[in-house]
Structure formats: C-alpha cells, structure tokens
Amino acid sequence: VGFKAGVKDYKLTYYTPEYETKDTDILAAFRVTPQPGVPPEEAGAAVAAESSTGTWTTVWTDGLTSLDRYKGRCYHIEPVAGEENQFIAYVAYPLDLFEEGSVTNMFTSIVGNVFGFKAXRALRLEDLRIPSAYTKTFQGPPHGIQVERDKLNKYGRPLLGCTIKPKLGLSAKNYGRAVYECLRGGLDFTKDDENVNSQPFMRWRDRFLFCAEAIYKSQAETGEIKGHYLNATAGTCEEMIKRAVFARELAVPIVMHDYLTGGFTANTSLAHYCRDNGLLLHIHRAMHAVIDRQKNHGMHFRVLAKALRLSGGDHIHAGTVVGKLEGEREITLGFVDLLRDDFVEKDRSRGIYFTQDWVSLPGVLPVASGGIHVWHMPALTEIFGDDSVLQFGGGTLGHPWGNAPGAVANRVALEACVKARNEGRDLAREGNEIIREASKWSPELAAACEVWKEIKLEFEAMDTL
C-alpha cells in the first residue's frame, strides 16, 4: 500500500528551492514571522501548503490526484534586513488552482485560512505577480485612462475633484447645491463620501436626482463636461446594480463603489455593468487600512491595488504623500505605476517584488485625497503627474468665501502649476513662489493661501521597506 498515514513536515513536500518558476504561475511574496522554534523553510512551506493543496495530515485521497501538478511551492526564502526572525518567502502557485476572472477565488486561496495558521506568528502578503494568462481572463477597468480623457475631453493636466462635506447629515437638495457650486467654480468632479449610501436624512434616489441637476446646470454654464461620483454601494448586489441603472438613466458620466466593504464579487459585477453601459467607475478603498496598515501582518496596499485593476475600476484612492493620510513617496509611486502603466519592472527600492506585465489591461487613475490644499498643489502635480485625480474636500469647502471660490482657487492653482511645469520650472523648488505669483491675479486663491498657510499634518512614516 502506497499510503502512509501520519503527520509529516510541510517542507518535505512544499519547500522546493530548485523549482524553476513558470510564466503561467502566480507568484507571491510573503513576509513570514514564524513562531519561535519553527525554521523558516518549514514556515514558508506551511504557507505554500495551506494556501494550496495541503492540510495538516497526510490523507489517502492525495493519491487520487497529482500533487506535483497542483501544489503551491515555496521556492525561495530570504531574511528581511533589519528584522530578526522575519523572512520573505516566495511561493509559486500553478494557474490551475484558480477560477478564471475571479479575484474572490484568488484571494480565498492565497490570503485565506493560511493567515490564521498557528506555526506563523504573523504573515503579510507583500506582492503578487499576476501572469498574463490569468490577467487575460479579466475585463479589468470599465474604460481606463485614455477613454476617460476622451469622454471628458480633458487633456494635459490632472483632474480636480472634491468630496462633499459634511459627509453625513445634509439633505439631498442642500447636497446638490454644494455639488453645483463646486462644479461651477471649476472642478471636474465632486464626490459622494464613501459612507453616503442611502440613509434616513438623504435617500439615494433623491441625491442622484439633485446631483444630476447640478451636473447639467454647471455643464451648461461652463461648457465643460462635469461629473459627480454617485455612490452605488448598497447592502445587496441587486440594490447596487439598481442604483447604477438609475444613474445611467440620468445620463451622468460616473458612479462609485467602496470595493473592499462591498467585496470583489460585487465590484466585478458593477465594473462589467459600467463597461456595458458607458459609465466610469470611481473606487474608494474604505477599510484598506484594516488590512494593510500593520507592517508584519495582512496585505500590502499594492496587492489590493493590483486586485482592483483586475476586478475593475477607473479611479482608485491611493494616498497623497503630502496630506493627512499616510503614504511613503517611493512606495506610493510604486503602486501608482502598477495602477497606470502597462509594464512595471521589479524594483525592490519601491516595494515592487516582481515584474508585472498587464498585457494591455486598461489603466486606473490614482486619486490623491485627504488633507490636501492649495499649497500642496505643486508637489502633487510633480509627484502624480497628469494621469491622476487630485481631490480637495475641506480644501475646497473650507474656503472662507464659500464653495465656488474654493473651487476657483484650486483650479487656478492647478493651471498655474501645469503651466509652470510646461515652461520647464522646477515645481519642487519653486512651488510656493508659483502659487504666490498666481494668487496676485486670483483673489480666491489669495484667500485660500492665507487660510492654509500654517497647516501641517505630518507624522513619522509607518510604511517603510
């Protein structure tokens, strides 16, 4: 009898340092902190086993399949510099383990039960290499960067947005008024806050109607295409699609979804609906910090960003580097490139563990949002470049003269920065000077400069390599 019962070390089956990775494998880089006394090879192999074909004991049904064909393999382990008893374990998964076009299934395997595993004290997924063969099974973003620019007829600069505040408590009509004022003043977009769904003080249908009116009116008056991210997130997928259908009937350009609280299944359904019906899709990452903020456990945001590009979204919030929400510059730019570019080289200094080829999957616009104001504009323009959305909530609505002047101040600041950059000036060095010059001929900008000249929201960076 070939079957031998009992418990054997994972590393005998799942640690294979001689393995040559295939182009079709999904590759994962895990930061593993083993329990005291557990050797790194065993911990790495345990991760590979528990996230693929393994279980805690030998089972006779193993003989009914080819483990060699289907098992995950830990093929390389390296210590983490500056940390004791922490290792990066590289695991290769055969493509056959995953359902086509399902981020849900991919995550259920790779970041499922294994994170509660006793032999590992902590576990963090740092990066994933999605092979081209798997990428091709996803639709990806409904439209992507180029199509969005063509729909909006806006080129050569970042787009400007604003989250309507106070985020909860306004009636639909007052909310619509704030939307109109911001768009009329010069913003491209306004945004529902992520927690605005359909509450007693403002039901979704009323909000959609008043915001649509604000869009039509501001478009007619400015001659520019405007949008408001109508949050379609709901308690059920059916209700979510119902809201997206209503948005389409109002002929608005864009809807919004909270992809982590809503879930990848709902998000992918909405992305498919948006592509089929010409709606852009703005994605908010509420709940990401629950998953990505701990350095040694959870999942890095670059993995959540890659997963979103597969699942589908045209915009996603990606930190600011300069505002109230954290994000280290090089690391942030690493996953911003993973969102926008077609091909990204491995670069460990930016936290990118694998070369990623997106094979023409559309790109996603990164959104910088949270605690930013006119003085940040030169830095944001320089860091994020043209293909981005810069969102000023308090930085628009907090203007001493009101919402429309707040929008004017931001638009003037942005246009001044883009013009200066195109003339070859150094935004990093001359940023303050550029804003000061522009404020001489824009009283709205001058007032904004005065209000926010002393504001600093800076703490020690937490996301380090």
From Swiss-Prot:
The record's comment on cofactor binding reads: Binds 1 Mg(2+) ion per subunit.
Which chemical reaction does it catalyze? 2 (2R)-3-phosphoglycerate + 2 H(+) = D-ribulose 1,5-bisphosphate + CO2 + H2O; D-ribulose 1,5-bisphosphate + O2 = 2-phosphoglycolate + (2R)-3-phosphoglycerate + 2 H(+)
Residues that hold substrate according to the record: 113, 163, 167, 285, 317, 369
| Positions bearing N6-carboxylysine | 191
List of catalytic residues: 165 (proton acceptor), 284 (proton acceptor)
Q: InterPro entries annotated for this entry?
A: RuBisCO, RuBisCo_large_chain_AS, RuBisCO_lsu_C, RuBisCO_lsu_C_sf, RuBisCO_lsu_fd_N, RuBisCO_lsu_N_sf, RuBisCO_lsuI
Record-marked site positions (Transition state stabilizer)? 324
- HAMAP family per record: RuBisCO_L_type1
Keywords from UniProt, A to Z, are: Calvin cycle, Carbon dioxide fixation, Chloroplast, Disulfide bond, Lyase, Magnesium, Metal-binding, Methylation, Monooxygenase, Oxidoreductase, Photorespiration, Photosynthesis, Plastid
Of which family is this protein a member?
Answer: Belongs to the RuBisCO large chain family. Type I subfamily.
* PTM entry text: The disulfide bond which can form in the large chain dimeric partners within the hexadecamer appears to be associated with oxidative stress and protein turnover.
Q: Which co-factor is required?
A: Mg(2+)
The further comment given in this record reads: The basic functional RuBisCO is composed of a large chain homodimer in a 'head-to-tail' conformation. In form I RuBisCO this homodimer is arranged in a barrel-like tetramer with the small subunits forming a tetrameric 'cap' on each end of the 'barrel'.
Known partners and oligomeric status: Heterohexadecamer of 8 large chains and 8 small chains; disulfide-linked. The disulfide link is formed within the large subunit homodimers.
Subcellular location(s): the record lists:
Plastid, Chloroplast
Q: Which domain of life is it from?
A: Eukaryota
Q: What is this protein called?
A: Ribulose bisphosphate carboxylase large chain
For this protein, the record's CDD domains field holds: RuBisCO_large_I (cd08212)
GO terms for CC?
chloroplast
Q: Name one Pfam family in it.
A: RuBisCO_large
Q: Where does Mg(2+) bind?
A: 191, 193-194
Function in brief = RuBisCO catalyzes two reactions: the carboxylation of D-ribulose 1,5-bisphosphate, the primary event in carbon dioxide fixation, as well as the oxidative fragmentation of the pentose substrate in the photorespiration process. Both reactions occur simultaneously and in competition at the same active site.
Q: Which residues carry this modification: N6,N6,N6-trimethyllysine?
A: 4
Which Enzyme Commission numbers does its entry carry?
A: 4.1.1.39
What GO annotations for molecular function exist for this entry?
Answer: magnesium ion binding; monooxygenase activity; ribulose-bisphosphate carboxylase activity
Q: Which gene encodes it?
A: rbcL
| Protein's organism | Ulmus alata (Winged elm)
